[in-house]
């Protein structure tokens, strides 16, 4: 398990360390990515301390890693237990923004 309170940079380094090998070993036909926002520092149930920027960078990293390796990705939103609905909606929008950027970056 990840340590409680893990912040953006450490989380993203951990993701970069494991995701490419995981994909290479499994070679999925399709990646189903649940872009939960409960790792956010403001989430009342989550145990990590990611910022909005960290969530966006995570989504970019996951999507870019998958697409660059040739794996199709389907994204869903999930998790997120903030009391401020506007903040929660914004956090859920980040994966859509990341997907749009990756789409244009890779000319899909």
Task: Name the predicted role of every residue range.
Residues 1-108:
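A general "terminal functional-core" signal
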